[in-house]
UniProtKB/Swiss-Prot annotation:
Keywords: Cytoplasm. GO terms for cellular component: cytoplasm. It is found in: Cytoplasm. It comes from the Bacteria. The gene is tusA. GO terms for molecular function: sulfur carrier activity. Coiled coil: none annotated. This is Sulfur carrier protein TusA. One of its GO terms (biological process) is tRNA wobble position uridine thiolation. PROSITE patterns: UPF0033. NCBIfam families: PRK00299.1. Pfam families: TusA.
């Protein structure tokens, strides 16, 4: 999903250096503040986000548009559900 790297987003969450459960807790707040249909980019370094963020999206009905891993940094693009 490297084509997502330069995609314009409506918000960015930098969770670099934070460990579970902090990235998902912060994600919950950022998604809440995002407009419906908005695109959020998440930057994380905790490997557990590879499991936690996709589950978060499924559980709360948001769309995981893309994800990318490079040199221990995990990038996610999440579209907030509409309505």
């Amino acid at each position: 999903m490297s084509e997502m790297i330069n995609t314009p987003v409506d918000g960015t969450l930098d969770a670099t250096g934070l460990n579970c459960p902090e990235p998902v807790m912060m994600l919950h707040q950022h998604i809440r503040d995002l407009v419906p249909g908005g695109l959020l980019k998440v930057i994380a370094t905790d490997p557990s986000t590879r499991r936690d963020i996709p589950k978060f999206c499924v559980f709360l009905d948001h769309e995981l548009v893309g994800q990318h891993e490079e040199a221990g940094t995990y990038l996610y693009w999440i579209r907030k559900k509409s309505g």
